[in-house]
């Protein structure tokens, strides 16, 4: 009984143990691998806390969500994108989508897909809000005399030039599924399941940060987009609604990009 109580007491402070271990390993990494201390400590702490508090399903979904883009980047910059590369990409893509959906269903963080989770009016309102914040950021860009684009968008435009349009379009549209599953559902239903305010703030900032903002304009662009999508999920807790709004917005951007091209 004593040992059980002692272990239970120790479990309350597992975060302290994780952070201490992360700092120790980071110090070793600096001396052996010459890695940046603070970034290494932060990454190890986050990963350690995820496992310590049994949140590893989020980490799995996060890794899966990055596989298609990782494959595309490797193929595009190592050599000319071949037919075999395209086939491999779509195999990875399908496995990623299917695996992510099945993992999320098994973890019971999203319901089984059904038409009732696709309310047309709410989807239209969500899209309209994204369109509105896009106009606002465009006006802001004119006020500060800046080109209405971001480094992340420039990188995507460059990638578009060297990969097949089918691959680029698939990646763009799939972001609606993968990013909402990781940055909205994963944060609200796994990482901070019982802390809605922490969940909201984390989802808001993490989504914006992962899009690589480099200045005030890009932070505003992705921050406001994240605010709309995070607010939508916080209010309705409907993954399929968020996915639809995000996918529709990306489809709109894709069509505009193809027309301008």
Swiss-Prot record:
Chain segments annotated as transmembrane: 15-35, 43-63, 84-104, 123-143, 197-217, 239-259
Keyword Transmembrane included in the entry's annotation: yes
UniProt-listed GO biological process terms: CAAX-box protein maturation
GO molecular function terms noted in the UniProt entry: endopeptidase activity
Superkingdom of the organism of origin: Bacteria
The protein's name: UPF0177 protein YvdC
Gene name of this polypeptide: yvdC
Membrane topology: Multi-pass membrane protein
Record localization: Cell membrane
Primary subcellular site in the record, as a coarse category: membrane
Keyword presence, Transmembrane: yes
Record's GO cellular component terms: plasma membrane
Coiled-coil spans in chain: none
Family to which this protein belongs: Belongs to the UPF0177 family.
Keywords, alphabetical: Cell membrane, Membrane, Transmembrane, Transmembrane helix
